[in-house]
């Protein structure tokens, strides 16, 4: 059914749909948007209702049957879908162009109110290759929803297919498992406040006009700046670093920026990820499953700014209770010489046995001689990193504590 013609405002609206870069007609692979449905409703107005209403029903029924949270993944979404389902960006291809496009696509869906979103890592259609899959695995480890997925006709592209990609996966997927407490906390804030998990830089730095045109870097929450390598054969990557102090999350090297581009040399096994000075996040130890990771002790990473304070938070629950879950909420603050962890809510029983392994403080300019709790396990003057071990004091995450050093 087609009711075409330049005068048909429903089939030929004054905008284009950028679908896989093809800018197809709005009715492509569907019935005419000028067609009338039951109730005298135009397809133009009703087309997107199918996906969102199916999402609502599927999510509701699954939760009623299991009496716990469901996880529904949908490609057909609409504003409001984010309260019910996750989204993936559709049938991409194993190309460098689609790797690049994945970043702004994911960021836009976060702004649409669909925070749990990701692209098919390594590409859905076509044959991926070692370099592309290595770069995509590193990048995809920081998607809100991370999944390597391709069609049945395409060659296998699991991380074990290429030894190099296996090494990349161990590093970056391993880091994702470490960051799950932080990512889960971002999911909590997305749920109750509407903040995207993956954010364009301009959202965190709205007065910095240099961030407005950045398409391929992104913030994971307010704390982590991800600078993907998106070009084939690249041996360096240039990213913009807003004013402040930024610490590499892998080797703790520091960038002090007034708001400028920085070029970093990269091997196949590198992707710059920096924690923002002034933020604090909680991490687990790496593991093979999220269930196993949740049973490991916490490390708390404190990134001190050049001057002033740092803060962060942690949200914990059982991951399954649907409404009014029993939760523990912890607030972290730090300044020069002091770190404080304050429990604001303490209803999740699982937090009672969750130990804090160590507190890592970045930006400590001189070696301290003593700490008020635990012991100094390391001070590295090159990275200005202080590590305070709490393993001997059996400090749990659900009780207040303060550490001072001098």
Predicted regions and their residues:
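Catalytic-domain carbohydrate-binding cleft regions of carbohydrate-active enzymes
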Residues: 1-276
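Intrinsic disorder/low-complexity detector
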Residues: 8-14, 20-21, 30, 169, ...
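Intrinsic disorder/low-structure terminal segments
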Residues: 9, 14, 70, 142-144, ...
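Polar/charged alpha-helical tracts
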Residues: 198, 253, 335-336, 381-383, ...
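Generic beta-strand structural signal
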Residues: 219-220, 241, 334, 379-381
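Solvent-exposed beta-strand/loop surfaces of large extracellular or lumenal domains
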Residues: 249-268, 370-391
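Accessory, solvent-exposed terminal regions and/or long lumenal/extracellular loops of proteins
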Residues: 273-374, 385, 390-398, 405-406
């Amino acid at each position: 059914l087609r009711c075409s013609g330049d005068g048909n405002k429903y089939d030929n609206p004054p905008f284009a749909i950028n679908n896989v870069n093809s800018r197809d007609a709005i009715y492509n692979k569907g019935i005419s948007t000028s067609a009338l449905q039951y109730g005298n409703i135009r397809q133009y107005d009703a087309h997107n209702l199918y996906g969102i209403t199916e999402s609502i029903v599927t999510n509701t029924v699954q939760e009623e049957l299991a009496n716990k949270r469901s996880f529904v993944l949908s490609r057909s979404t609409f504003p409001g879908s984010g309260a019910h389902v996750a989204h993936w960006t559709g049938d991409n291809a194993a190309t460098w162009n689609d790797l690049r496009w994945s970043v702004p696509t994911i960021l836009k869906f976060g702004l649409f109110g669909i925070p749990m979103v990701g692209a098919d890592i390594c590409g859905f259609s076509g044959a991926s290759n070692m370099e592309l899959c290595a770069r995509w695995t590193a990048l995809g480890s920081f998607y809100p929803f991370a999944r390597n997925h391709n069609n049945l006709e395409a060659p296998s592209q699991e991380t074990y297919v290429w030894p190099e990609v296996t090494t990349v996966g161990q590093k970056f997927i391993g880091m994702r498992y470490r960051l799950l407490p932080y990512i889960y906390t971002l999911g909590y804030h997305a749920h109750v406040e509407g903040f995207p998990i993956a954010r364009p830089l301009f959202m965190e730095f709205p007065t910095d006009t240099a961030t407005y045109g950045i398409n391929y870097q992104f913030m994971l929450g307010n704390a982590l700046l991800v600078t993907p390598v998106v070009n084939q054969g690249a041996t360096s990557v240039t990213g913009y670093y807003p004013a402040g102090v930024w610490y590499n999350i892998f080797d703790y090297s520091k960038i002090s920026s007034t708001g400028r581009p920085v070029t970093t040399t990269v091997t196949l096994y590198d992707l710059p990820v920096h924690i923002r000075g002034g933020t604090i996040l909680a991490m687990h130890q790496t593991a093979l499953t999220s269930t196993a990771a949740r049973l490991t002790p916490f490390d708390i990473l404190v990134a001190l700014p050049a001057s002033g304070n740092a803060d962060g938070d942690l949200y914990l629950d059982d991951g399954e209770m649907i409404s009014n879950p029993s939760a523990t909420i912890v607030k972290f603050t730090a300044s020069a010489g002091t770190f404080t962890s304050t429990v604001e809510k303490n209803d999740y029983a699982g937090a009672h046995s969750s130990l804090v392994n160590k507190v890592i403080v970045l930006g400590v300019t001189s070696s301290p001689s003593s700490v008020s709790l635990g012991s100094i396990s390391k001070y590295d003057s090159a990275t200005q990193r202080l590590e305070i071990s709490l393993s001997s004091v059996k400090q749990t995450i659900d009780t207040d504590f303060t550490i001072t050093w001098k």
